[in-house]
Amino acid sequence: MPNNNDNFSVVLANNQISVRNIYAVVRNYPAHAKEMGSTVNNEPIFFQKSLTSLHTGAKIIIPPDRNIHHELEVVVLVGTPGEFIDQNTAIDHVAGLALGLDLTDRDLQNTLKKQSLPWFLSKSFKGSAVVSEFRMKTDGIWEKEYWLKRNETIVQTGKIDQMVFPITKLIEYLSAKTPLLEGDLIFSGTPQGVGPIKQGDNLELGVAQEIFMEIEVE
């Protein structure tokens, strides 16, 4: 199997962590909101990806007849469960951070949007929640620019301090709507530069000079 992750887990400090829920936030970078013809929101807006969309392997298989887009994101791993978490203590609930791709069936998403329907089906196909190994939240590398390369060309870059709603605010807001569990993942939004991928592409995700993940698209 290309995923090799049928137990739906991620890795932090050589430990396997079982994933419970996968949440994602929309339009958390102003430039991305603009490129999508939209604006940022007054409050975070979340959607969910299916647990079966989780992918940690070095190869992904995409439907050849679909317009699949990459969306590079910093992914949060919840380590300590809680609800109604205060922003000032929210970081204490974070076990680690990773890079990920919120792969999106763009044509299907646009069709669902026009019908005012949820995006779930366009965001939850098998392999659409790509996640690297997690790093400790205290790792100073997270202050640096993160990036996505497609066939050795940088197509997306971002920094955590460019977010409209910082990670701690996302945790505060989401935990007030639904309890967060140990092993929950939060995709924290994508910077500008989203675009299509196709079979034969090679993708690299990294921060500063360090490569976090290499992926072959099949």
Predicted regions and their residues:
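Catalytic-core "active-site belt" of small-molecule-metabolizing enzymes
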Residues: 1-181, 185, 193-218
